């Protein structure tokens, strides 16, 4: 029978690995009005702070704790006075505020996710104040800064759903007694892209333009030329091609992580009804699904 001790009020046998607290999902819509022309940024922000002391954990002493409600209010006020030019600059502003305002804050971490609003446009004319929700990839960022250190900035894309109906296959894989999957030269390829990249600390970055560039590269390597496509022998190859092209075209990026679920569409068997279904009617299969991941970084020699 296990025996449990009750004398952990002051214990020398355990130590903290990491601590933090904060406020998640602080939602803000910021409107910038330039006459009748309006611009918007809707974001959800999460903030985590690490303090120099642990007395709130050890003794229930809250004298160093910045209330999470104060953190929420601070984010709202910073949005008002600083605006949201990009979610990355907004996240850096939040980190710098808490580190400069409170000497006992030793680390600030901020996650910001942008709601994908797009301005109405018709025949090349942009509407002055109307927007449409366009879920074709969500822009997010993660910024971490420790006291006396530079901010480490990651940007990313998630929830970018793409599908092509041909120019994909999967052959030459290992087959054992449990393998039932047939080789296929032509199949549907569908995925929901998640990718995240880290910026070089010593470079000025146009975050909005860089995000647009990376998204365009992802779509380009997935789809290929518009008139004929591009063959993908595996999800892994497509993933790697995206990374190589991105680091080749965007010098501001140091490393890149991508996760691609392989979302299956299965041919529906209609033989019992006397019909031959030639990959015309498919069953979308939510799960289970394969998931392929990879992270690449620049070699040291490529930075010189």
From Swiss-Prot:
<feature type="active site" description="Charge relay system">
    <location>
        <position position="68"/>
    </location>
</feature>
<feature type="modified residue" description="N6-acetyllysine">
    <location>
        <position position="278"/>
    </location>
</feature>
<protein>
    <recommendedName>
        <fullName>Uricase</fullName>
        <ecNumber>1.7.3.3</ecNumber>
    </recommendedName>
</protein>
<feature type="binding site">
    <location>
        <position position="187"/>
    </location>
    <ligand>
        <name>urate</name>
    </ligand>
</feature>
<feature type="binding site">
    <location>
        <position position="170"/>
    </location>
    <ligand>
        <name>urate</name>
    </ligand>
</feature>
<feature type="modified residue" description="N6-acetyllysine">
    <location>
        <position position="122"/>
    </location>
</feature>
<feature type="active site" description="Charge relay system">
    <location>
        <position position="264"/>
    </location>
</feature>
<comment type="pathway">
    <text>Purine metabolism; urate degradation; (S)-allantoin from urate: step 1/3.</text>
</comment>
<comment type="similarity">
    <text>Belongs to the uricase family.</text>
</comment>
<dbReference type="GO" id="GO:0005777">
    <property type="term" value="C:peroxisome"/>
</dbReference>
<keyword id="KW-0597">Phosphoprotein</keyword>
<feature type="modified residue" description="N6-acetyllysine; alternate">
    <location>
        <position position="221"/>
    </location>
</feature>
<comment type="function">
    <text>Catalyzes the oxidation of uric acid to 5-hydroxyisourate, which is further processed to form (S)-allantoin.</text>
</comment>
<feature type="modified residue" description="N6-succinyllysine; alternate">
    <location>
        <position position="10"/>
    </location>
</feature>
<feature type="modified residue" description="N6-acetyllysine; alternate">
    <location>
        <position position="10"/>
    </location>
</feature>
<feature type="modified residue" description="Phosphoserine">
    <location>
        <position position="63"/>
    </location>
</feature>
<keyword id="KW-0659">Purine metabolism</keyword>
<feature type="modified residue" description="N-acetylalanine">
    <location>
        <position position="2"/>
    </location>
</feature>
<dbReference type="GO" id="GO:0006145">
    <property type="term" value="P:purine nucleobase catabolic process"/>
</dbReference>
<feature type="short sequence motif" description="Microbody targeting signal">
    <location>
        <begin position="302"/>
        <end position="304"/>
    </location>
</feature>
<feature type="binding site">
    <location>
        <position position="235"/>
    </location>
    <ligand>
        <name>urate</name>
    </ligand>
</feature>
<feature type="modified residue" description="N6-acetyllysine">
    <location>
        <position position="185"/>
    </location>
</feature>
<dbReference type="GO" id="GO:0019628">
    <property type="term" value="P:urate catabolic process"/>
</dbReference>
<dbReference type="GO" id="GO:0004846">
    <property type="term" value="F:urate oxidase activity"/>
</dbReference>
<feature type="active site" description="Charge relay system">
    <location>
        <position position="23"/>
    </location>
</feature>
<feature type="binding site">
    <location>
        <position position="68"/>
    </location>
    <ligand>
        <name>urate</name>
    </ligand>
</feature>
<feature type="modified residue" description="Phosphoserine">
    <location>
        <position position="39"/>
    </location>
</feature>
<keyword id="KW-0560">Oxidoreductase</keyword>
<feature type="binding site">
    <location>
        <position position="262"/>
    </location>
    <ligand>
        <name>urate</name>
    </ligand>
</feature>
<comment type="subunit">
    <text>Homotetramer.</text>
</comment>
<feature type="modified residue" description="N6-succinyllysine; alternate">
    <location>
        <position position="228"/>
    </location>
</feature>
<feature type="modified residue" description="N6-succinyllysine; alternate">
    <location>
        <position position="221"/>
    </location>
</feature>
<dbReference type="InterPro" id="IPR002042">
    <property type="entry name" value="Uricase"/>
</dbReference>
<feature type="modified residue" description="N6-acetyllysine; alternate">
    <location>
        <position position="23"/>
    </location>
</feature>
<feature type="modified residue" description="N6-acetyllysine">
    <location>
        <position position="175"/>
    </location>
</feature>
<feature type="modified residue" description="Phosphoserine">
    <location>
        <position position="232"/>
    </location>
</feature>
<feature type="modified residue" description="N6-acetyllysine">
    <location>
        <position position="27"/>
    </location>
</feature>
<feature type="modified residue" description="N6-acetyllysine; alternate">
    <location>
        <position position="228"/>
    </location>
</feature>
<feature type="modified residue" description="Phosphotyrosine">
    <location>
        <position position="289"/>
    </location>
</feature>
<dbReference type="Pfam" id="PF01014">
    <property type="entry name" value="Uricase"/>
</dbReference>
<feature type="modified residue" description="N6-succinyllysine; alternate">
    <location>
        <position position="23"/>
    </location>
</feature>
<feature type="modified residue" description="N6-acetyllysine">
    <location>
        <position position="164"/>
    </location>
</feature>
């Amino acid at each position: 029978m296990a025996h449990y001790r009750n004398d952990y009020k002051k214990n020398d046998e355990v130590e903290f690995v990491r601590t933090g607290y904060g406020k998640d999902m602080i939602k803000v819509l910021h409107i910038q009005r330039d006459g009748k022309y309006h611009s918007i940024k809707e974001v959800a922000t999460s903030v985590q702070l690490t303090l120099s002391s642990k007395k709130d954990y050890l003794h229930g002493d809250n004298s160093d704790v910045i209330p999470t409600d104060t953190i929420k209010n601070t984010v709202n006020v910073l949005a008002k006075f600083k605006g949201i030019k990009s979610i990355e600059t907004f996240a850096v502003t939040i980190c710098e505020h808490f580190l400069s305002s409170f000497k006992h804050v030793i680390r600030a971490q901020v996650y910001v996710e942008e709601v994908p609003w797009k301005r109405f446009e018709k025949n090349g004319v942009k509407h002055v104040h109307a927007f449409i929700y366009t879920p074709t990839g969500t822009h997010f960022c993660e910024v971490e800064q420790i006291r006396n250190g530079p901010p480490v900035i990651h940007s990313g894309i998630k929830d970018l759903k793409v599908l092509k109906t041909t120019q994909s296959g999967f052959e030459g894989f290992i087959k054992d007694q449990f393998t039932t999957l047939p080789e296929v030269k032509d199949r549907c390829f569908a995925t929901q892209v998640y990718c995240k990249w880290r910026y070089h600390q010593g470079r000025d970055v146009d975050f909005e333009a860089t995000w647009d560039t990376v998204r365009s590269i992802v779509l380009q390597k997935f789809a290929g030329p518009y008139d004929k496509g591009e063959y993908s022998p595996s999800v892994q190859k497509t993933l790697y091609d995206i990374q190589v092209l991105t680091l080749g075209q965007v010098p501001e990026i140091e490393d890149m992580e991508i996760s691609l679920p392989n979302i299956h569409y299965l041919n529906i068997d209609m033989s019992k009804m006397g019909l031959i279904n030639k990959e015309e009617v498919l069953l979308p299969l939510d799960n289970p699904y394969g998931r392929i991941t990879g992270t690449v970084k620049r070699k040291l020699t490529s930075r010189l």
